[in-house]
């Protein structure tokens, strides 16, 4: 593509140091900061939690009510809105969750008890017949709640299966009881990937609105400078 040609042989720098240019597939309309990996986000000031739309407002931590109402909406305006994984849903049977989350016994409930900037799940508390288990970090939460048998229904109605982890940790969880008394957890989700840095489909969406590569890179890696490799 033209952007690839124009950036060939160049690197992004922040205060004279090459950056960690993290990227992922699709956003939920928001990004996360480097704190999702337990890292001090202050070490990566160019990796911010922002709204992935015109203006790119910076985001702080959010409570469950605010984020849950956001992630359940499919009409959110964002650069990624038109992509199927912008919103997705799945059902996790309690017996499947109980088999792969050790220490809780037969699971009776689960709640997101901490969210990072942008609303990404950072801590999940699981309650069962044997006690309470706390799962921390977006990667661990995605692994705990994912299973290859789950059917992920995308925004466009398409489905995917076979993934051992959830597509992202931008999630809201709703406990449901079936007519037969079986317990399950309905998961509303958005985006695909860890959510830090540049959304590839968000960048595509920006390009479609006429944004150039410099604008796109500055949006996702704020305050950085693109230089020839030999300038560093």
Language-model region placement:
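Conserved, single-site charged/polar hotspot
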Residues: 1-232
């Amino acid at each position: 593509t033209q952007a690839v040609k124009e950036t060939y042989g160049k690197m992004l720098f922040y205060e004279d140091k090459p950056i960690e240019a993290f990227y992922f597939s699709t956003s939920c309309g928001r990004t996360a900061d480097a704190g999702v990996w337990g890292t001090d986000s202050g070490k990566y000031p160019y990796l911010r939690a922002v709204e992935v739309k015109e203006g790119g407002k910076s985001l702080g931590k959010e409570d469950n009510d605010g984020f849950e109402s956001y992630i359940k909406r499919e009409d959110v305006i964002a650069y990624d809105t038109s992509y199927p994984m912008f919103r997705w849903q799945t059902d996790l049977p309690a017996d499947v969750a109980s088999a792969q989350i050790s220490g809780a016994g037969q699971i009776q409930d689960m709640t997101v008890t901490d969210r990072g900037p942008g609303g990404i799940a950072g801590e999940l508390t699981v309650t069962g017949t044997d006690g309470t288990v706390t799962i921390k970090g977006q990667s661990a939460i995605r692994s705990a709640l994912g299973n290859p048998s789950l059917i992920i229904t995308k925004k466009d109605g398409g489905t995917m299966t076979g993934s051992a982890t959830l597509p992202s940790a931008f999630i809201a969880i709703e406990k449901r009881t079936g007519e037969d008394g079986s317990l399950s957890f309905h998961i509303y989700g958005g985006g695909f990937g860890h959510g830090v840095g540049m959304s590839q489909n968000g960048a595509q969406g920006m390009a479609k609105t006429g944004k150039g590569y410099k604008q796109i890179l500055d949006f996702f890696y704020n305050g950085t400078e693109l230089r020839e490799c030999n300038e560093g």
